[in-house]
C-alpha cells in the first residue's frame, strides 16, 4: 500500500506558501492571526 504523505517542496509551497496566503483576504487573515498569536513561523517552510 502506498503511503499518503509523498513530500514535494513545490506542491507544499503552492498550497500553503506565503504568496498563496497573501493572494486572498482570508489568507491575509491567517497571517495576521498568527502574527498576533506570536508565531515564530507564519507559514510552513522547508
Swiss-Prot record:
Instruction: Tell me the GO molecular function terms.
Output: structural constituent of ribosome
What PROSITE patterns does the annotation carry? RIBOSOMAL_L34
Taxonomically, the superkingdom here is Bacteria
GO BP terms: translation
Q: Name one Pfam family in it.
A: Ribosomal_L34
Q: Which UniProt keywords apply?
A: Ribonucleoprotein, Ribosomal protein
Show the InterPro entries listed in the entry. Answer: Ribosomal_bL34, Ribosomal_bL34_CS
Query: Record's Gene Ontology CC terms?
Result: ribonucleoprotein complex; ribosome
Keyword match Coiled coil: no
HAMAP family for the chain:
Ribosomal_bL34
Give the family per the record. Answer: Belongs to the bacterial ribosomal protein bL34 family.
| PANTHER family hit by this protein | LARGE RIBOSOMAL SUBUNIT PROTEIN BL34M, MITOCHONDRIAL RIBOSOMAL PROTEIN 34 FAMILY MEMBER
This one is known as Large ribosomal subunit protein bL34
